[in-house]
Design a protein with these regions (language model features):
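Secreted, periplasmic, or luminal enzymes acting at the cell surface/secretory milieu
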Residues: 1-16, 20-26, 30-34, 38-51, ...
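Extracellular/periplasmic ectodomains of large secreted or surface enzymes and adhesion receptors
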Residues: 21, 27-68, 180, 184, ...
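Hydrophobic helix-and-loop "lid/oligomerization" segment in the mid-to-C-terminal part
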Residues: 32-131
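Intrinsically disordered, low-complexity Pro/Gly/Ser/Thr-rich segments with frequent PxxP/GP/PP motifs
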Residues: 263-299
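Terminal connector regions
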Residues: 292-335
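Disordered, acidic Ser/Thr/Pro-rich linker "stalks" and the adjacent N-terminal cap
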Residues: 335-389
C-alpha cells in the first residue's frame, strides 16, 4: 500500500487491521493469505498456464474453509511495485499469479463476496465484474488505507471517486484511451454470431469517469446561455442534480462537448468541466459550468488552433458513457450573431479601444472580456470605454 516513492518508516494499518478495528466486540475475523502476489513462474505464467502446486492449492483451500465459516468474504487482490511502476510493462492485464483462482474458489462457496483491489494500473477483471457483486477499487490507498477501506465496506463512508482512466476488457483493445475518435474502438461489423462479421467485443470494462455510490442521483433541467455565440464568447451551462436515494453522498457531475461537424476528425467527447457535490437525501443543487472558447478549439489542417463555426453537442453525465442530459450550442462567425438578435436593440455609441483593461473601466457591453477581430484575422481582447470620443 506504500510503494517505494515515499518514506517507509511510518505506521501502517492493513485492510485486516482496519476491519478488526471496525467490527463489534466478540466478532471473529478469520484471515488467511490465500495466495502470493505472483506465482513462481511469473511473468511467464502470464503467457503459459501452469498447474497449481500442492502448496498453492493448500492456501486456496484454507481460504475456502474460512469463507464457508463466515457471513461475508473480503478478498483483497491486486498488485504492487513489483507488477506496476517505471519500466514495469506487463504481458497481460489480468490479475497476476493465482489471484483469479483464489477469487473463483471463494465465490464458488456461495457466500457473499466483496473484492477489494489494491493496484496501480487498470486490471482486466472481466470474470469478477460478472460474478462478484461488490468491487472496491482502492488503488494504492496509503499508510492508513486499511482504515479508509473498512469505513467504506461498513458503510460509514459513501465513496464518490470516479475513474481518471479507462479499464479495457483485454490487451487486444489497447490503445484504449479517453477521449477517442469516432469508430476508433469498433471494427465496423454489424452482425454478431458465428456467421457475422463482429470480430471482437467492443467497449471498455469501466469507462473514464465511472464510479458507484451507495445512493442514486437524478439529473434534470439543462440550459445553455447563450445558445448562439461567436468564436470568442463563453457559454454558460446549468443543470440540476437530485439525491434520490436514502444516503447522503457525493456525485461528480461531468460536462462533455462534441464538435458535430468539423474540417478534421475530432473526439467523440471532450471533458471540459466537472464538479463534485455533496447532497443529502432528497436535496437538489443547481450547477453552473462555463465553456470557454478554448474548450471548443481544434487543430486544423494548417496546424492552427481555431474554433470552427457550427453546432456543438453539450452533454452532462455521471461518466463518459453515462450521459444524462443533452443540449447544443451554435458557434457563428464574428458579426453574424447579430442575425439571431434584434437589430433595434443595439444602440450606437462612440468608443475608444485600449489594450489595457484598467484604462477603460467602463465597457460597451458590460463585459471586460469582449473580444474584437483584428485586421489580420486574429482575435485581440480590448477594453471599451462608453461614450468616449472616437480615436
Amino acid at each position: 500500500a506504500l510503494t517505494h516513492y515515499g518514506p517507509l518508516a511510518v505506521e501502517v494499518t492493513t485492510v485486516l487491521e482496519g476491519i478488526q478495528n471496525k467490527v463489534k466486540p466478540g466478532t471473529e475475523v478469520l484471515f488467511t493469505k490465500g495466495c502470493d502476489l505472483v506465482d513462481a513462474n511469473w511473468p511467464e505464467s502470464e503467457l503459459i498456464r501452469y498447474p497449481l502446486t500442492s502448496e498453492e492449492q493448500s492456501e486456496i483451500d484454507k481460504a475456502v474453509e474460512n469463507a464457508k465459516k463466515s457471513d461475508v468474504a473480503v478478498v483483497v487482490l491486486g498488485g504492487s511495485n513489483r507488477t506496476c511502476g517505471e519500466n514495469k510493462s506487463r504481458s497481460s492485464l489480468e490479475l497476476p499469479g493465482r489471484q483469479l483462482d483464489l477469487l473463483q474458489a471463494v465465490v464458488a462457496t456461495g457466500k457473499p463476496v466483496v473484492l477489494v483491489l489494491i493496484n496501480g494500473r487498470p486490471i482486466s477483471i472481466n470474470w469478477a465484474d460478472k460474478y462478484v457483486p461488490a468491487i472496491l477499487e482502492a488503488w494504492y490507498p496509503g499508510s492508513q488505507g486499511g482504515t479508509a477501506i473498512a469505513d467504506t465496506l461498513f458503510g460509514d463512508y459513501n465513496p464518490g471517486g470516479r475513474l481518471t482512466v479507462t479499464f479495457p476488457k483485454t490487451v487486444g483493445q489497447i490503445p484504449f484511451n479517453f477521449p477517442t475518435k469516432p469508430n476508433a474502438q469498433v471494427d465496423g461489423g454489424r452482425n454478431k454470431g458465428l456467421d457475422g462479421n463482429m470480430s471482437r467485443v467492443n467497449g471498455p470494462l469501466y469507462p473514464f469517469g465511472y464510479g458507484l455510490s451507495y445512493t442514486t442521483f437524478e439529473y434534470s433541467d439543462i440550459s445553455i446561455q447563450p445558445a448562439i455565440v461567436t468564436q470568442v464568447q463563453p457559454v454558460t451551462v446549468r443543470c440540476k442534480v437530485t439525491n434520490t436515494g436514502k444516503r447522503a453522498g457525493d456525485e461528480v457531475v461531468q460536462l462533455y462537448v462534441r464538435d458535430i461537424l468539423s474540417s478534421v476528425t475530432t473526439y467523440e467527447k471532450n471533458l471540459v468541466g466537472f464538479d463534485r457535490i455533496h447532497l443529502n437525501p432528497g436535496e437538489t443543487k443547481e450547477l453552473t459550468f462555463t465553456i470557454e472558447p478554448r474548450d471548443l478549439q481544434l487543430l486544423n489542417s494548417d496546424n492552427h488552433w481555431v474554433v470552427e463555426p457550427g453546432d456543438f453537442k453539450v452533454m452532462v453525465g455521471a461518466s463518459s458513457e453515462d450521459i444524462r442530459l443533452n443540449d447544443r450550442c451554435t458557434v457563428v462567425e464574428y458579426g453574424k450573431e447579430q442575425a439571431a438578435t434584434s437589430a433595434t436593440s443595439r444602440q450606437q455609441k462612440s468608443v475608444i479601444a485600449s489594450s489595457s483593461q484598467e484604462s477603460a473601466p467602463l465597457v460597451l457591453d458590460g463585459n471586460l472580456s469582449t473580444a474584437w477581430k483584428a485586421n489580420k484575422g486574429e482575435y485581440i481582447t480590448f477594453a471599451l470605454e462608453n461614450n468616449a470620443s472616437p480615436n
